[in-house]
Amino acid sequence: MANYFNTLNLRQQLAQLGKCRFMGRDEFADGASYLQGKKVVIVGCGAQGLNQGLNMRDSGLDISYALRKEAIAEKRASWRKATENGFKVGTYEELIPQADLVVNLTPDKQHSDVVRSVQPLMKDGAALGYSHGFNIVEVGEQIRKDITVVMVAPKCPGTEVREEYKRGFGVPTLIAVHPENDPKGEGMAIAKAWAAATGGHRAGVLESSFVAEVKSDLMGEQTILCGMLQAGSLLCFDKLVAEGTDPAYAEKLIQFGWETITEALKQGGITLMMDRLSNPAKLRAYALSEQLKEIMAPLFQKHMDDIISGEFSSGMMADWANDDKKLLTWREETGKTAFETAPQYEGKIGEQEYFDKGVLMIAMVKAGVELAFETMVDSGIIEESAYYESLHELPLIANTIARKRLYEMNVVISDTAEYGNYLFSYACVPLLKEFMTTLQTGDLGKAIAEGAVDNAQLRDVNEAIRSHAIEQVGKKLRGYMTDMKRIAVAG
C-alpha cells in the first residue's frame, strides 16, 4: 500500500489540506436521525470506543461491539467495559455482516489488521468509520469501492466526550468523507448523524478532509501538545534543581504549573494567559517567547515537513514492525528522568504563584502554540483546523501531566502521539540547552521584581499578542462554543 497523500498531485494535495468549513447549527437540524433504525457496530472498546458508544446509544442509536474472539473468551478489559455497560458484544463474524456502519476505534497500529478482518465481512453498501485518518492517509488502506468511508474526530479524549455530553453539550469535532469512497453520495449525511449522536454538533463541527485531519493532528501532538510539554518539563525541572530549588517543590511547580497556566489559555487564549502576569513579567515572557520561536522554528518546520512527506509515518511504521523497540526504549528512559522520579511536595502552591514563578513556562507555551499554528498554516492547513490542533487541546494534555506527570500523558495519548512526542522532545532538549544558560533571576522559580515599565513598549507588546492570527480565530471559535453551550443548556 502507498501513502495516499503522496499519490495525489500538488493541486489535489493543497485542496485537501485546505479543506475546512465551520458548519452551521441548522445543518444538524435532523440530529442523528439518518442512522436511527440502522445497526452501528463499534470495533474496539477503549476510551473513544466506549464513550462514543455511550453517547450514541443515549442519542437513540442501535450500538453493539465487535471484539476479537480471544478478547471475548478471555474476558479482557474491552469485553468487560462493553458488557458492564449493557452493550451487546459479539465476534466480528457475528456482528459485522449485519452492520450498516462499522466504526473502527482501535489504536492506529491495529487498523490494517482490523480492516483486513472486517472488510470481507461487511455487506455491500455499508459504511466504515474512523476517528483518525492515519490508516487511510498514511498507510494508504484500500477500501472496497461499494463501501462509504467517513470520519468523525472529536478534538478531546474519550472521557471528555462523555462528560460534555452528560452536561448537555459536546466537544468540537472534525468530520470528513473520503473522496475515494462515497459511492452513494451519503457520506456527509452519515458523518453528520454520527457527530450529532456524540453531541459534537452542540460545540461546533468543522467539515474537513482525512488529509487535513491527519496532517494537522500529527503536527499538533508532536510539537506543542506533547513534545513541548515533555521537553519543557525536563528542561525546567533540571534548571530549577541546578539553581538550588528543592526538587519536590520544583516538580510540583512544573507538574501542576502547565495545567494552571493553560486553564487561562482555555478561557481567553494567549492574551488572558499573558494578562495573568505583572507588566514587567509580561514583557519578559514576551521577549523569551520571541527568542524561543527563533530557536525552535526549524525544528517545528522539520516535523511539519516530515509529516507532509510521509517520512514520519514510514519511520514509525518501521518501528511497529520492529516490535516498538524505539518507542519502548524512549518510554523507559523518560520514566527514569529526574523529573519523573522526584519526590512529591506536600506544601501548597497558590494559583498566582504558578504564573509569577513560571514566566519561562508561559513563554514556552506561547512560543509553542504560535509556532505550531504558524507552521501548519504555512503548510496549507486552514486556521480553524490549526487552532483546534494547537491551542484548544493543550489544557487537556496539561491535565494528564497534573495527574501523574509525563507517565500519565504518555499513557493517555495514542502510541502515534507518544512516538512523535519523543522524536520532538529528544531533539528539543539539546536544542534549548544553551538558551537555558541565558536565563535571568525571575524567569523561573522566583518572581520578577516590580520595576518601571515603558508604556510604549507595553502597548506594542499587548497589541502584538492580541493581533496574532491564532488570537483572532480563537476568539471567534471560543465565542461560538460559549454561545452553543448557552443554547444547549437553555434547551
Curated annotation (Swiss-Prot):
GO terms for molecular function: ketol-acid reductoisomerase activity; magnesium ion binding. It is an enzyme of class 1 (oxidoreductase). Pfam families: KARI_C (PF01450), KARI_N (PF07991). Involved in the biosynthesis of branched-chain amino acids (BCAA). Catalyzes an alkyl-migration followed by a ketol-acid reduction of (S)-2-acetolactate (S2AL) to yield (R)-2,3-dihydroxy-isovalerate. In the isomerase reaction, S2AL is rearranged via a Mg-dependent methyl migration to produce 3-hydroxy-3-methyl-2-ketobutyrate (HMKB). In the reductase reaction, this 2-ketoacid undergoes a metal-dependent reduction by NADPH to yield (R)-2,3-dihydroxy-isovalerate. It catalyses: (2R)-2,3-dihydroxy-3-methylbutanoate + NADP(+) = (2S)-2-acetolactate + NADPH + H(+); (2R,3R)-2,3-dihydroxy-3-methylpentanoate + NADP(+) = (S)-2-ethyl-2-hydroxy-3-oxobutanoate + NADPH + H(+). It comes from the Bacteria. Binds 2 magnesium ions per subunit. NCBIfam families: ilvC, PRK05225.1. NADP(+) binds at residues 45-48, 68, 76, 78, 108-110, 158. Its EC number is 1.1.1.86. This is Ketol-acid reductoisomerase (NADP(+)). Residues 209-344, 345-484 form the KARI C-terminal knotted domain.
